[in-house]
């Protein structure tokens, strides 16, 4: 369910705005999206896992907040990010 260190490093490299960037909204949203996708796959087999479902809702809420922040600060970066991640909004 969790994101491996190798996959996380790959995501950071792909979405970083500068060398060593791990905290930009783009990187955070990309990592959250990976975690959300992993949990969504988990729920296909474990439909009654309500404890993890609550965690999924928290992740979605965090991602939504970061996306709202990014849209408010720089709409071009926001549009590029949701296009790259395939998030509908």
Swiss-Prot record:
One of the primary rRNA binding proteins, it binds directly to 16S rRNA where it helps nucleate assembly of the platform of the 30S subunit by binding and bridging several RNA helices of the 16S rRNA. Forms an intersubunit bridge (bridge B4) with the 23S rRNA of the 50S subunit in the ribosome. It comes from the Bacteria. The keyword Transferase does not apply. NCBIfam families: S15_bact. PANTHER family: RIBOSOMAL PROTEIN S15, BACTERIAL AND ORGANELLAR (PTHR23321), SMALL RIBOSOMAL SUBUNIT PROTEIN US15M (PTHR23321:SF26). Keywords: Ribonucleoprotein, Ribosomal protein, RNA-binding, rRNA-binding. GO terms for cellular component: cytosolic small ribosomal subunit. This is Small ribosomal subunit protein uS15. Belongs to the universal ribosomal protein uS15 family.
């Amino acid at each position: 369910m969790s994101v491996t260190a190798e996959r996380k490093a790959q995501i950071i490299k792909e979405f970083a705005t500068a060398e060593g960037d791990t905290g930009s909204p783009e990187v955070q949203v990309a990592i959250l999206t990976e975690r959300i996708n992993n949990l969504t796959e988990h729920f296909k087999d474990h439909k009654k896992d309500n404890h993890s479902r609550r965690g999924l809702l928290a992740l979605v809420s965090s991602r939504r907040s970061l996306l709202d922040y990014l849209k408010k600060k720089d709409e071009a970066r926001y549009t590029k990010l949701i296009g790259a991640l395939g998030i509908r909004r």
